[in-house]
UniProtKB/Swiss-Prot annotation:
Database matches in Pfam families: 14-3-3
Family listed: Belongs to the 14-3-3 family.
Protein name: 14-3-3 protein homolog 2
Lineage: Eukaryota, Metazoa, Spiralia, Lophotrochozoa, Platyhelminthes
SUPFAM superfamilies, alphabetized: 14-3-3 protein (SSF48445)
InterPro entries linked: 14-3-3, 14-3-3_CS, 14-3-3_dom_sf, 14-3-3_domain
Length: 248
């Protein structure tokens, strides 16, 4: 059974331009499942995605999985409060259903990345984007897993983030929004998943400090994105400061 269902699958549409148009319309209508299926269909056709299309794919799945992540957090909190009560079993069943949905979506994205999107022919920027995305979705799996499964997803996330980081440091400027977004998410991974606040702070601070020295050279078309991510890095450093020994 597919992780996400949509009328687009039944329509049999395989025209690249039409699917991109559908994805854009779906985004405006906040129908993110349709948006995700449209972009997945393009990727599975073997077409290399341009920058706009990569962002459409990312936004679609971020919203689809984001709804489940939010539901899982709420249900997990309720389950803890209701432990030992008559509603405990029902709550646990519901929590597992949400967890299954989230897991299927993450595995769907990870399969798409490894089988269709990360190829030898794509450029460095696309490769960094996809490895970052791979790290993100393994991180989302690790959030809801325990034991050996959690260990495997955590290791896979770190490996993907590290591949993206090595490429980004060689290929992208310190103010590039993809490089900054990668540093933001990698630092969150260390803070939330690996419980390594000092490592998280060190990574976030290095990225912020490097970018702030080059802030005047940011291109107009990326200025808004880059400065927004820099602010998020700074916000996290402020939030985490009590647990860090770095000079922030």
């Amino acid at each position: 059974m597919a992780a996400i269902t949509s009328w687009i699958t039944d329509s049999g549409c395989k025209d690249h331009a039409s699917l991109v148009s559908i994805a854009k319309l779906a985004e405006q209508a906040e129908r993110y499942e349709d948006m995700a299926v449209a972009m997945k269909t393009i990727a599975e056709m073997g077409n290399e995605l341009n920058n706009e299309e990569r962002n459409l794919l990312s936004v679609a799945y971020k919203n689809v999985v984001g709804a489940r992540r939010s539901s899982w957090r709420i249900m997990s909190s309720i389950a803890k409060k209701q432990a030992g009560t008559p509603l405990a079993d029902q709550t646990d069943i519901y929590l597992k259903k949400v967890e299954e949905e989230l897991t299927k979506i993450c595995n769907d994205v990870l399969a798409l990345l490894s089988k269709n999107l990360i190829t030898e022919k794509i450029g460095a920027e696309a490769k960094i984007f996809y490895y970052k995305m791979m790290g993100d979705y393994y991180r989302y799996l690790a959030e809801v897993q325990e034991g050996e499964q959690n260990d495997k997803s955590t290791e896979a996330a770190e490996e993907a983030y590290q591949k993206a980081t090595s490429l980004a440091e060689a290929e992208l400027s310190v103010t590039h929004p993809i490089r900054l977004g990668l540093a933001l998410n990698f630092s969150v991974f260390y803070y939330e998943i690996k419980n390594m606040p000092e490592k998280a702070c060190s990574l976030a601070k290095a990225a912020f400090d490097a970018a702030i020295t080059e802030v005047d050279s940011i291109k107009d078309e990326t200025y808004k994105d880059s400065t927004l991510i820099m602010q998020l890095l700074r916000d996290n450093l402020t939030l985490w400061s009590s647990e860090c020994e770095t000079d922030s």
